[in-house]
């Protein structure tokens, strides 16, 4: 196979009108835990597991040891790519129409890479296949603490999950909600029929709840997964989830070769558009998180 020949592709600052795109949610984890600068490759992070304690020392008295323990946690690189093909006819269209289509493809590649952070970080899955990836060894789905929804008592489930996080010595700073959880919470009513949380609207743009930062995305339940998840929410101290961009490979067009196994581009009169990113992902302590899971069937 001939070597791929690529050329840079610069997206415009504003996307051309006339292209309809179904709205897609972005990464909840990115909203709740800020990215940290990282170098490429596996990185070890020292995590304090036993804090030192101060001691009163009498005049002339001896000082006792104050043990402190640390553990190593690994931040692992995860490479992700999105490749989309378009026909040469699209490339030959007039400039306004062409840039509208390509900008739309580019934006959706970015959305896919954003969603991938959640699918990998929460569910340990390959976003393309929906199956658990053997290369991903840890995800927030592995948290053992969980609160199960009872009927429609969404707020009580969140409260219970928050209590589990607090009992483990952490502070619940954020909540990642599936739209089913945020909508259920937003439409709860008291005994008189009045909405309990009218400020939440219909739960699609929730930014905070009970002092916690909130993010809503269907990546929390993982609609891409081949095996359905029962997770509808994650409560936790989200600085215990570490992520960053180790390498961001600019979007580019590929005009020659077979970059995705679907056939030679020149033979099929097509051009491929590719975007790639390398995330570094790690969880310092799963005890900093508690899941909110669906009610029993």
Place the predicted regions along the sequence by residue.
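Short, Lys/Arg-rich flexible segments
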Residues: 2-31, 89-96, 114-122, 127, ...
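Assembly/oligomerization interface modules of large self-assembling protein complexes
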Residues: 2-83, 288
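Extended oligomerization regions of viral-like shell subunits
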Residues: 148, 152-255, 260-264, 277
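Residues immediately flanking
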Residues: 86-88, 179, 275
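Alpha-helical scaffold segments that mediate packing/assembly in large oligomeric complexes
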Residues: 85-168, 291-292, 296-297
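Short helix/loop capping segments that flank catalytic or ligand/cofactor-binding pockets
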Residues: 53-56, 94-95, 184-187, 282-284
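Short loop/turn segments at secondary-structure transitions that flank enzyme active sites
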Residues: 51-53, 81, 90, 115, ...
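Extended, compositionally biased alpha-helical segments that mediate assembly or anchoring
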Residues: 256-297
């Amino acid at each position: 196979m001939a070597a791929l020949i690529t050329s840079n592709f610069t997206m415009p600052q504003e996307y051309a009108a006339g292209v309809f795109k179904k709205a897609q949610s972005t990464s909840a984890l990115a909203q709740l835990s800020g990215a940290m600068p990282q170098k490429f490759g596996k990185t070890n992070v020292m995590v304090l597991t036993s804090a030192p304690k101060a001691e009163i020392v009498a005049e002339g008295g001896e000082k006792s040891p104050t043990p402190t323990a640390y553990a190593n946690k690994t931040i692992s690189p995860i490479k992700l790519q999105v490749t989309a093909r378009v026909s040469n006819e699209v490339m030959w269209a007039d400039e306004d129409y062409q840039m509208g289509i390509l900008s739309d493809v580019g934006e959706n590649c970015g959305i896919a890479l954003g969603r991938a952070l959640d699918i990998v970080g929460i569910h340990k899955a390959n976003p393309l296949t929906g199956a658990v990836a053997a290369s991903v060894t840890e995800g927030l789905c592995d948290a053992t603490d969980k609160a199960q929804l009872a009927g429609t008592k969404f707020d009580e489930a969140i409260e219970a999950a928050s209590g589990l996080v607090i009992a483990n010595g952490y502070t619940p700073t954020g909540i990642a909600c599936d739209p089913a959880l945020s909508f259920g919470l937003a439409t709860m009513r008291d005994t008189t029929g009045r909405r309990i949380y009218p400020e939440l609207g219909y739960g699609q743009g929730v930014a905070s709840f009970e002092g916690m930062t909130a993010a809503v995305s269907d990546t929390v339940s993982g609609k891409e997964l081949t095996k359905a998840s029962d997770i509808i929410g994650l409560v936790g101290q989200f600085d215990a989830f570490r992520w960053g961009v180790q390498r961001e490979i600019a979007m580019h067009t590929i005009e020659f070769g077979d970059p995705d196994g679907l056939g030679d581009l020149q033979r099929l009169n097509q051009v491929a558009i590719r975007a790639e990113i390398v995330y570094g992902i790690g969880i310092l302590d799963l005890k900093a998180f508690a899941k909110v899971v669906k009610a029993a069937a």
